[in-house]
């Protein structure tokens, strides 16, 4: 297998460095907004990657239709982008006219893997999404509030506290993603070693 990160020696790579995870939500004013990106938050500044993430066909998936696929995959420049869309409860006041009755937030989880590792994408995406939904469903709306508070020029004590709470949630989600990736790749390697 080729090293997906050519400047990093393969033997020094951690399992969570094999993939990139993007957690986003749809904001009625700003569009597709990242909540977190791991392992490298600086990808927010990469216009090419963020353009791809924001136009991924997962955003057009109707998840209320039970016959829809569970996920949508996209291949681009040597990587596979596996994506899942789900809804979480929200108490956030919506800013678009006519959206006051919406009590849910649209969340998109995208997992990027090198194309020669795409066999692992579906299972890993499922594990990460199940764990985020199980452990963070009520907290994701707080994370969204924190991200919106960061955008505001004037930071009130309430918005500063919201940002602080959001950062703590974000760090916990990142730890969950890292642990899930490590555990998953270690279990896959053990299974492969046992059958070799």
Predicted segments with their positions:
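Acidic, low-complexity cytosolic segments
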Residues: 2-19, 29-196
